[in-house]
């Protein structure tokens, strides 16, 4: 089969990279088209994934609309030459539009409940929409839920083995506590109007006062006084760093989830509320702590200090999570090769595991 995958964000590279490798190993031709977004292209190159960049960046809504139109036209022209059997993406309208024009099958993955535009104008047109079980909305007959997370497509123990050398690379002493902090730009369409950590310098100062080392990864520029805390390792090593960390504090639900499935407690500071993955990881597994109200900054720092001073068994909480969840990459590849059977397995618990 010919399979087209589109990449809109660095997280999409992680989500699809193992599926791309497996599908190619099974004899399928996988064609990857990407748009520039943060370190997405760097990751594709780091993992050796052949790809073509067909869209750039924009910082305002008119610019984003123009780039989206150009992107979809370029995607259509390339897909028409390929004649794909399947096109897949994460929450991306271009794949749905182009697959409809070409008469091929599309698969759209999502785990973002507050993406209102997609729910209204993308998912109803898709052949198949796939989400984790925590996803609270019912999209329709084309919707199938699976027991996992996007992040388990690349951080399931069958897919990821942490490299302990990361500690030496960043000069971290064996008994030194590490906090990874993630700051987002709030420019994504579904993030506009939301906020996170009120005072970054204050957060860093108070965490370091506990004896922890703070490393920051940010979508934008850091204040000059914090530039020496910025992440200095290759972007594909971030998950080794999260595994080694004693705590994650940040504004990214994706990275909070990554930390949680690796067994690192995560504090999410964001005014975005109602995310199913955060709710499940908080209420069922106790691996994420979220703060969204007007006192979010102070409450988050207080919780961070208590975690650094505590002795909870986070590894046991991770074991409980993994016992309940699947390797998401297996689900992705199964859908590509046999959609009907795969969907039946996940919709009918009486059927045997496949």
Regions found by a protein language model. Give the residues of each.
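Conserved nucleotide-sugar phosphate-binding/catalytic loop shared by glycosyltransferases and other
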Residues: 24-67
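Catalytic donor nucleotide-activated moiety binding site of glycosyltransferases and closely related
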Residues: 37, 47-51, 55-58, 181, ...
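A conserved, positively charged/aromatic
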Residues: 107-109, 118-131, 242
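A nucleotide-sugar donor-handling region in carbohydrate enzymes
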Residues: 130-195
